[in-house]
Amino acid sequence: MNIRIENPKDYREVENLTREAFWNVYRPGCTEHFVLNRYRTSPDFIPELDLVMEEEGKIIGHVMFSKAEIILDDGSHFPSWTFGPISIHPDYKRKGYGLKLLKYALEKAKEMGIGLLQMEGNIEFYSHAGFDLASKMKIHYHAEPSDSEVPYFLAQELIPGYWGDREGTYCPPKGYFVADEQPEAFEAYEATFPQKEKILQPGQLPQFCQRCGMPLTKKEDCGTNADGSTNFDYCQYCYHDGRFLQDCTMDEMIEHCSQFVDEVNKQMPKPLTKDEYKQMMHGFFPMLKRWRKDG
């Protein structure tokens, strides 16, 4: 086994590895390979921590790191770092390679003076590399209430005392949202790879219509593209044959959805009034793809 810095001749192979590693894991298809492709030219990218793992001369794993920041409660910006995607070829998963690659990368990061990392992931895996809930360090996740314990948001202080007793909020760097911000570029890039079937399946992250917020739990819930294929971003009530069924603003969509608050309340631990539901949606909708720029 060998771990080394990625070089340009590895790029396509590593992007294909990343695509294979993430396909249909967290969502139908994946975008992580496009994130990696675009991140290499970002000022946040850290070339010294762009690492590949080889086994018998074959690249079987990869990880990249990025600069990030935390907004402290006084409004100032505190330097931190994040990492990912971290990819292991499907044939080598669950054999300890991912943890070996990560621990090696963390040691290199510490040697470079990187004091604090935060990321989204499964604590059952990442705790073996020293990560714990970020809320224990008073680091809040931008998309969740500041007083909540977010089970997937993790952090680790690599240099003792670097973070200290500070408190602040973390938002992932913009580079991780490039597929949402450049959908046409992503589709063109994705078309350069062999076609693979996208599947909506149990175990993935919860999927929501990126326009109305409706949960997407099965293929039949989803909209359709102009060629008749499934569109996993939008529901059948919002998107059909490659177009939105009607134009509206975000506020108009929230007003429309609020009519169904009684149905929503069947899934809620505590019933919401119509006004409470609308207030909640004003926090949620700006994170949806259709409204992200407006938000």
What are these regions (language model features)?
Residues 111-114, 121-147:
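Conserved active-site alpha-helix within GNAT-family acetyltransferase domains
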Residues 92, 96-104, 114:
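Conserved acetyl-CoA pyrophosphate-binding loop and the N-cap/start of the following alpha-helix
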Residues 15, 22, 26-64, 69:
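Active-site rim helix/loop that mediates acceptor-substrate recognition in acyltransferases
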Residues 1, 58-62, 81:
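Glycine-rich phosphate/pyrophosphate-binding loop shared by adenosine-nucleotide-utilizing enzymes
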Residues 209-212, 235:
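Short cysteine-rich clusters marking metal-coordination/redox-active sites
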Residues 222-232:
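Short linker/helix segments within small regulatory modules
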